[in-house]
Amino acid sequence: MPGEQTSASTDPSSPREPSDILTSDVLLRRFFETSAAGRRAAASLKRGAAVGVRFTDVPGDFRFYAQDGRPHFDMGKAGDPDFELTIAPGAVRAITSKPESDVGDLGITFFQHIVAKDPSEKIQVKLHAGLLKLTMHGWLGVLAAGGPKVIGWMAQKGLKGPSAVASALSRLKKG
């Protein structure tokens, strides 16, 4: 019928806007604020853990960090990031379209976009910290929270055993 609204995304009383009109930074911030998996992953992070974030479709610097076990994502440059991410819009959409996923599924999606060949889907990683600092900041706890799903995915990519993390880190440092 004319004037009748049939979807929640067009309903003016709906609390959510359609994701196709939101910028990557807003989508990612909302994801971290509402996703149980994002909160669970951030709970492993320690004081000082930080990620510098840039988007290929949004200008400016952003930072991700945890405070009191809760994820925070805001505009500004990370002071001493453990690593920096440059995230394409396709990767943002893939991650944020799964708010109900668990930490394992979220981790696999993240890693799939690190190895993606398509620039519109890619997450580029520039690692600044070594294994000791990453461990002290809780990043291995985040990996462990992904459990068998992430470990299985890594094994399929040839990263097996205790040296898998060190091998993956060395690949990221080389770029």
List the predicted regions and their residue ranges.
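Feature captures hydrophobic
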Residues: P2-G175
